[in-house]
Amino acid sequence: MSILEDHAAPLRRALDELGGLDEPLRAAADSIVRSFRSGGKLLAAGNGGSAAEAQHLTGELIGRLHPARERQALPAVALHADTSTLTAVGNDYGFDQIFARQVEAIGRAEDVLLVLSTSGASQNLLSAVDAAVNRGMVTIGLLGRTVRPLHELCTHVLAAPTDSLQAIQECHLVLIHVLVEQVEDLLAGTDA
């Protein structure tokens, strides 16, 4: 087996099982669309590679997924992207509060918080979800298979069906693309 085949094996197995997430994916997309239609926005948060994927998600919503499908920009914010706020809050309140303080400042009941985590146990994401729940927000978790605290707190859970950290992140990217595609379909009225 080549090194690429070795790396791809757990991903291939996980991708084969992603079909089991159709219902939670549709429910998450529906919640996001309801938020947008009521004047809300999507807030996204993650750490490390998951932060990069959170920003990828917000870029797809503000931009577009399909070049042939023009649509309005959708309101989405990656909470890790404002480095001045991140470091100020981290310095004054601690790393565990870097996302929660932002949710407290800009989160509203009509908004959605989407968190990405391979561990499902990052304290700064748990604090952010708590802050979102206190505001009456819908929360979505793109997580790993192993049930951790975030699984219990999020309104919708899209759990990558693997224990491989790399495959979890790679599944999250697929889930992001499918989620944005579902949102675009619902907004365009073309969802089957």
Task: Please report, for each region that a protein language model flagged, where it lies by residue.
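Generic N-terminal amphipathic, Lys/Arg-enriched alpha-helix
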Residues: 1-20
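Glycine-rich, small/polar surface segments that engage phosphate groups of diverse ligands
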Residues: 34-107
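Short glycine/serine/threonine-rich phosphate/pyrophosphate-binding segments
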Residues: 50-55, 121-128
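Short, well-ordered beta-strand core segments
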Residues: 113, 139, 156-158
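Short, glycine/polar-rich helix-capping loops at beta-to-alpha or helix-loop-helix junctions
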Residues: 142-154
